[in-house]
């Protein structure tokens, strides 16, 4: 869709560069927009696998630094979108140069030097859809988990505005002698610490959303009158974490899921509403798994951004033995 829009704009303004011409001009001229101390730097393009996508990353390498040097990455595709919107190459370059310099100033020294002895406590999980992320998986340590894959990231910063960090690639893992099993053990400990999990009734999630949208308190209260009388077995829960980022990682923690399932009192279906949260409900109250799968698939297509989609499948958690399985198309 983006490139359809790009072609439409280009046809209306023949003076604008196409993507390939824009990319070449960035490679030739971007350094000239940076302060003088960056004049001896080189600029490199790297394919950067993102969740459900792959972007062209642009990195600046100072003279004498190894290629493993960790520079902030910006993306050619996103700069080109900005160029199409403002029709000014110079403006896009100036804005990006300011952003890059500010990012470098605030990067911790252990990140810049890729000092993994001090970064070990910042390594976390990220679960992604295996089928939709073949390019990412091919280039990084990972392990399969049902229809998903576990990859590893280093978290640079996390706050209410978002998460910044980078993917641990095969190149990084080899250079630092990091085995996948070692990464898994580190991430198992760190993820729960950096992103503390939380669970709440879906009504509480909806109340907070309505409050953000400016709905009056009395109207919110009226909308959920009587919800406390809903039997435990019929209640629906949302699992995420304190920052509401990558909350679906809870799938890797049986103890987190079991706590919610026990409060419901039956086996439960787990719906991956996005990479950031899970919805948990009783298999007895909501017995038709095919309808739940359709609900997840339709919600993904119509309401969830591509980068936030986890899976069109649903999962079943056993209250008896704590096992978790992917529910197949044929399950009913």
Per-region residue spans from a language model:
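N-terminal alpha-helical "arm" segments
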Residues: 2-52, 56-58
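C-terminal structured domains
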Residues: 242-332
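Charged, low-complexity surface segments at secondary-structure and domain boundaries
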Residues: 6-17, 76-82, 162-176, 241-246, ...
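Charged, alpha-helical interface segments at or near domain boundaries
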Residues: 46-238
């Amino acid at each position: 869709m983006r490139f359809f829009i790009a072609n439409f704009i280009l046809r209306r303004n023949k003076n604008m560069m196409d993507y390939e011409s824009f990319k070449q001009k960035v490679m030739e001229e971007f350094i000239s927009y940076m302060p003088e101390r960056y004049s001896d730097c080189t600029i490199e393009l790297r394919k950067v696998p993102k969740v459900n996508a792959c972007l062209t990353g642009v990195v600046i390498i100072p003279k004498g630094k190894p290629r493993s040097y960790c520079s902030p990455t910006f993306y050619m595709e996103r700069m080109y979108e900005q160029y199409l919107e403002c029709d000014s190459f110079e403006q896009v370059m100036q804005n990006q140069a300011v952003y890059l310099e500010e990012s470098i100033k605030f990067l911790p020294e252990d990140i810049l030097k890729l000092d993994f002895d001090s970064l070990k406590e910042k390594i976390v999980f990220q679960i992604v859809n295996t089928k939709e992320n073949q390019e990412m998986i091919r280039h990084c340590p990972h392990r399969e988990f049902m229809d998903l894959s576990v990859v590893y990231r280093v978290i640079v910063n996390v706050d209410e505005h978002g998460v910044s960090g980078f993917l641990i690639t095969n190149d990084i893992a080899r250079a630092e002698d990091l085995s996948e099993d070692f990464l898994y053990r580190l991430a198992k400990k760190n993820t729960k610490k950096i992103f503390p999990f939380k669970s709440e009734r879906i009504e509480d999630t909806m109340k907070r959303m309505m409050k953000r949208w400016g709905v009056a308190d009395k109207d919110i209260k009226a909308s959920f009158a009587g919800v406390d009388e809903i039997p435990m077995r019929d209640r629906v829960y949302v699992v995420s974490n304190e920052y509401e980022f990558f909350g679906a990682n809870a799938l890797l923690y049986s103890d987190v899921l079991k706590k919610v399932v026990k409060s419901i009192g039956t086996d439960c279906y787990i719906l991956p509403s996005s990479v950031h949260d899970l919805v948990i409900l009783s298999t007895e109250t909501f017995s038709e798994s095919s309808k739940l799968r359709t609900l997840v698939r339709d919600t993904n297509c119509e309401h969830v951004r591509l980068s936030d989609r986890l899976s069109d499948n649903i999962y079943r958690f056993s209250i008896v033995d704590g096992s978790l399985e992917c529910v197949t198309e044929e399950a009913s």
